């Protein structure tokens, strides 16, 4: 079974990719999750990391310099270079299989309504399956677009960055399946936070704002596609 690794270290962090970013020396929590993701945390940002790398990515160690450098690289060649100045804690843990979040009543109803009226995603769309199971959890809706291409839909009541990250992980996994690939993504929610919309757009994920009242048959506005 895969393990999650927790490291507390004095370190500097450099991101090298589409842009560059530098975090000066400080004590930080380095989180290596079983899904392959790596994130760097401080003590003042709740759950949000200072920097991160989404799976699939690979960790190697460069030990030729004065301090070891942990290099996390993804398939696009982007890197997190973590220079380790000192380690205070390093432990690994098996968390077991997580049952996942249980959708609240509104999200479950949104999923059912969108599955019933799949044309709201676009003309010619057809539903393949609700709760399409993957190795990392169920995709809310798996559909086909008007050209027969695969589309994965993640549905939230409030669309935030963690929802986009969740859909990104599903897409990366589904696109390894030669039967389904290429798979596009749609992030659907009653309200989508600006940061989540920017991240989704940057990753080629389409956003759909849902009007719950309209979907229940009440006249309260139009659907908005962005």
From Swiss-Prot:
Enzyme nomenclature, EC number: 3.1.-.-
Location (main, coarse): cytoplasm
UniProt keyword annotations, A-Z: Cytoplasm, DNA-binding, Endonuclease, Hydrolase, Nuclease
Family: Belongs to the NucS endonuclease family.
Matching CDD domains: NucS-like (cd22341)
Subcellular location per the Swiss-Prot or TrEMBL entry: Cytoplasm
InterPro entries: Endonuclease_NucS, NucS_C, NucS_N, NucS_N_sf, tRNA_endonuc-like_dom_sf
Protein name: Endonuclease NucS
Biological role: Cleaves both 3' and 5' ssDNA extremities of branched DNA structures.
HAMAP family xref list: NucS
Matches recorded under Gene3D superfamilies: 2.70.180.20, 3.40.1350.10
Gene Ontology CC terms, in alphabetical order: cytoplasm
Domain of life per record: Bacteria
Organism: Mycobacterium bovis (strain ATCC BAA-935 / AF2122/97)
Enzyme class (EC, first level): hydrolase
A GO molecular function held by the record: single-stranded DNA endodeoxyribonuclease activity
